[in-house]
């Protein structure tokens, strides 16, 4: 099956999963939350599907559980693969114009250092992370192969008590890796999709 055919098939499946998750876990909502959602118990990490890994990311950020969030990313020690992230060219240009030097690469240990600082950017409430398909960038493409590679192009929105923390579009590559063949994020291609709110990539560059 070609990547294009896989993409169409995966998008159809995703639409079904999206409907289930939207009604059950709120994963793909994009509206401003009415109030902080800090209540409820912690869910165990689940990496059986890309959607469950996304749900783990969402839940972990809301609960300020940086350990579980980082587990969603590939790690050389645990998975024998490294996570990498890239930045929107406009974010890199803006950062360089401020007289600072952008990092040559962004890997798991960088995200591990950054994430606690990201969570202090707005200390007034819990963070809510929402995803929705970015069809302009291709939606979902299923490349298959030994690692059952899938690329999800998603708009993301991070809110804290009704205030935006970060917004953008991410091309997230999921692959089955490690001893348990878990679906982890191996690559994050960050893009701007709004002029009014900083991207996750800009937050990474600024360290919070």
Which sequence ranges carry the predicted segments?
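Short, low-complexity N-terminal intrinsically disordered segments enriched in polar/charged residues
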Residues: 25-63, 71
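Short beta-strand edge/turn micro-motifs at domain boundaries
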Residues: 26-42, 149-208
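Acidic/histidine-rich, surface-exposed loop or edge segments in extracytoplasmic proteins
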Residues: 31-41, 51-54, 81-100
